[in-house]
Amino acid sequence: MQKHIKEYLKHFDLGEQSLITCEYCLRSGRIDAGGFDIHHIQGRGEGMDVIGNLVCLCRKCHIRVHDKGEINKDQLLLIHRYFLIGRKIKFRK
């Protein structure tokens, strides 16, 4: 398992088989039961494998970020900050 995935799961005390929700879909009340990807908000060369830079996305939203450009970094960062605040996790850049 890749380091950034381990980091994300560790922060939320999740196992590999845990139900994980897409942070982008969750903001609008949707839950996608498909596969998930842990996405770097700032690219690997720009950011690190820290919880403030890692967001969980369903495959549909991940495609919307990379292939379609429908979701940008600023949107992801804002949604992720609210997600962390809702779980009482301090946001660190």
Would you name each region that the model predicts?
Residues D13, Q17, G29, D67, ...:
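Short linear sequence elements within intrinsically disordered, low-complexity coil regions
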